[in-house]
């Protein structure tokens, strides 16, 4: 077949596909209009930079996982607050039946506008999510958590009944169904997941996430969040030091890390990140316990400087802007070359 005949055959095939499935259903990649990936901020300056595009991408599946009390729900509530600031409509599928509205409000979530569902079974949770996503009116949906998506067969069965891989099958089927709708409606779908230990692992990490392997493959971004220390005021613990690692990223280079403080009652400390990243990039000068900006001392001790930045938002915003402009340097500093994904 000559090149001309090939081109005619392809053109006829493309025309037939467009006639059957609508305009835009198939095209050459070069003809597709290039659109920059839109992102929603995570509420953490360091994590936004680590993700490479300024936040989590729209129209993608995201997995946030970690041990108990590591800050998974706090991070997703910040995501909702940031999406709502941009005028987005958000939904929260609370399969764990553990969402605290008062805490969500403290983190900046408009609880009057947040759609919430507390389903009885895993099938019900995923059907509700599917219906909301297909509506086209939801910008972000959070499913908390994969471990709590218990199949109906398990709930209706007897205690001790073996339900081998029923949850993994449920997740695999649901994700096959959801993926196309998520992409078409540009809805961010965030799954919160827990960590379990694999039995009999001799080499490598024994940790794994619940719900089988399907979510690992379908997720465009996977974020591992860990509590690495406590923040104390004298003897009282007032927060936790947190490390996040982007273990999978289909929209930017993976394995970047970020550190931030989660303060009890108020969530991620933006001021703490501005200080740490400012010092790292030589925007804020640190001499002993004193911190200076533009040769002017702004406080002694990290907690005092955090308070100063809270009271002077114009200086805080100015430093943040410079940090974002120099973000490429931060990603080089935070790049973890040793990380590998186990899927």
From Swiss-Prot:
TM helices/strands, residue ranges: none
Record-listed ATP binding positions: 66-73
GO CC field: cytosol
Keyword Transmembrane helix (UniProt): no
Major subcellular site: cytoplasm
Cysteine pairings via disulfide bonds: none
Presence of keyword DNA damage: yes
Pfam families: RecA, RecA_C
Any one GO molecular function term: damaged DNA binding
Keywords: ATP-binding, Cytoplasm, DNA damage, DNA recombination, DNA repair, DNA-binding, Nucleotide-binding, SOS response
GO biological process: DNA recombination; DNA repair; SOS response
Organism domain of life: Bacteria
HAMAP family in UniProt: RecA
Family label: Belongs to the RecA family.
Name of protein: Protein RecA
Biological source species: Rickettsia massiliae (strain Mtu5)
């Amino acid at each position: 077949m000559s090149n001309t005949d090939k081109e005619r055959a392809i053109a006829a095939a493309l025309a037939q596909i467009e006639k059957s499935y609508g305009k835009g259903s198939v095209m050459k990649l070069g003809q597709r209009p290039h659109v920059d990936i839109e992102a929603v901020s995570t509420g953490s300056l360091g994590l936004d930079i680590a993700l490479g595009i300024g936040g989590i991408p729209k129209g993608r599946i995201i997995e946030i996982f970690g041990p108990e009390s590591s800050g998974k729900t706090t991070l997703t509530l910040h995501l909702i607050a940031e999406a709502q600031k941009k005028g987005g409509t958000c939904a929260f599928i609370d399969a764990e039946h553990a969402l605290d509205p008062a805490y969500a409000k403290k983190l900046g979530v408009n609880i009057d506008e947040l759609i919430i569902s507390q389903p009885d079974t895993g099938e019900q949770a995923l059907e509700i999510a599917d219906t909301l996503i297909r509506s086209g009116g939801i910008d972000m949906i959070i499913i908390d958590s994969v471990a709590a998506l218990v199949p109906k067969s398990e709930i209706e069965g007897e205690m001790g009944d073996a339900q081998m891989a029923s949850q993994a099958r449920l997740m695999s089927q649901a994700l096959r169904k959801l993926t196309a709708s998520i992409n078409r409606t540009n809805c961010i779908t965030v799954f919160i997941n827990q960590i379990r230990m694999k039995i009999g692992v001799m080499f490598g990490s024994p940790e794994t996430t619940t719900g089988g392997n399907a979510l690992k493959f379908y997720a465009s971004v996977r974020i591992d969040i860990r509590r690495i220390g406590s923040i104390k005021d004298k003897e009282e613990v007032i927060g936790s030091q947190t490390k996040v690692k982007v273990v999978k990223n289909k929209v930017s280079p993976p394995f970047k890390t970020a550190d931030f403080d989660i303060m009890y009652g108020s969530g991620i400390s933006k001021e703490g990140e501005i200080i740490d990243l400012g010092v790292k990039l030589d925007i804020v000068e640190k001499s002993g316990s004193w911190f200076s900006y533009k040769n002017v001392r702004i406080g002694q001790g990290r907690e005092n400087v955090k308070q100063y930045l809270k009271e002077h938002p114009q200086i805080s915003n100015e430093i943040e802007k410079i940090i974002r402009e120099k973000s490429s340097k931060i990603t080089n500093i935070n790049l973890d070359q040793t990380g590998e994904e186990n899927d």
